[in-house]
């Protein structure tokens, strides 16, 4: 009986340490994580977010296609990849699915002033001052009409992060060469293979929504992803960081069950052996 009391005391001490001390230490070391703002309420958006797709295509070809392609509609960028890298130190994204993953209010603000929307004064794309608010609405309507629907987490991650970040464990490599990324951002962006284990999921959601809230001073621009897109990216990073978690958890339950049975048998055996002595 004495041994059982000692075991119970140890269990209580461990549980208090795990559920009491550890969360407190984490809160002291990491502080409060800001909640994501999917309304992008800091942006004063005057541009339209709807319009005529046909007019939008004309405006896209005239104003965007020199740097950006649109594979979904057979439009190739006027500038090839190597020329773009030489000019901007980063590959301009294909915009086929941008309207499916980025909030349309953010997208409108981004087209008008990329530096302000991304909170990155060094962002390579210039403001589109020649476009009226109505023009922006037409472009967004066009982008929405060609975008693929219901992209999964992997697809969104590649769309949103693949120009700068590699995920080598999944054989996904950044479109932009490392030396150019270093020149553009100041350092090579980290590989995302195990980011889902290295960082808490709540932190990742906040960081993706607005990098400055998670890491003030970072050179990563704000992406403007919708809540759904962000959650899919975080879920994907979590899944690939520990792809065997479900199998391990199932096995773990069997191991715990086995240990419980063995503890019970050991205790019963001990009582039987020592009952005449005690």
Label the predicted regions.
Residues 71-90, 162-193, 248:
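Short glycine/threonine-rich turn/loop motifs
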Residues 1, 238-278:
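C-terminal single-pass membrane-anchor helix
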Residues 53-100:
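Extracytoplasmic/periplasmic/luminal assembly and interaction segments
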Residues 56, 60-71, 107, 139, ...:
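The canonical Cys-X-X-Cys-His
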Residues 21-27, 88-100, 110-136, 146-149, ...:
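Axial heme c-ligation environment in periplasmic c-type cytochrome domains
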Residues 67-74, 100, 112, 144-145, ...:
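Detector for the c-type heme attachment site
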Residues 29-61, 75, 135-158, 245-247:
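Electrostatic cytochrome c docking/interface patches
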Residues 1-47, 64, 106:
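Hydrophobic secretory-pathway targeting helix
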């Amino acid at each position: 009986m004495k041994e059982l009391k000692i075991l119970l005391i140890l269990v209580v001490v461990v549980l208090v340490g795990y559920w009491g001390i550890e969360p407190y230490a984490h809160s002291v070391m990491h502080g409060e994580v800001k909640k994501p703002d999917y309304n992008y309420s800091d942006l004063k958006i005057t541009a339209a977010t709807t319009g005529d797709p046909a007019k939008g295509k004309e405006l896209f070809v005239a104003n965007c296609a020199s740097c950006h392609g649109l594979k979904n509609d057979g439009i190739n960028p006027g500038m090839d990849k190597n020329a773009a890298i030489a000019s901007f130190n980063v590959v301009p994204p294909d915009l086929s699915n941008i309207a499916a993953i980025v909030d349309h209010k953010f997208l409108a603000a981004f087209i008008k002033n990329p530096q302000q929307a991304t909170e990155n004064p060094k962002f390579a794309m210039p403001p589109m001052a020649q476009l009226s608010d109505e023009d922006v609405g037409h472009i967004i309507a066009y982008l929405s009409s060609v975008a693929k629907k219901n992209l999964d987490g992997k697809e969104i991650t590649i769309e949103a992060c693949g120009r700068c970040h590699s995920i080598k464990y999944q054989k996904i490599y950044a479109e932009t060469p490392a030396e150019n990324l270093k020149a553009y951002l100041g350092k090579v962006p980290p590989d995302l293979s195990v980011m889902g284990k290295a960082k808490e999921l709540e932190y990742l959601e906040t960081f993706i929504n607005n990098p400055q809230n998670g890491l003030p001073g970072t050179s990563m621009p704000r992406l403007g992803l919708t809540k759904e897109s962000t959650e899919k990216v975080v879920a994907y990073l979590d899944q690939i960081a520990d792809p065997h978690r479900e199998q391990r958890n199932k096995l773990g339950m069997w191991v715990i069950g086995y240990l419980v049975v063995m503890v019970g048998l050991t205790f019963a055996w001990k009582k039987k052996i020592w009952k005449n002595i005690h």
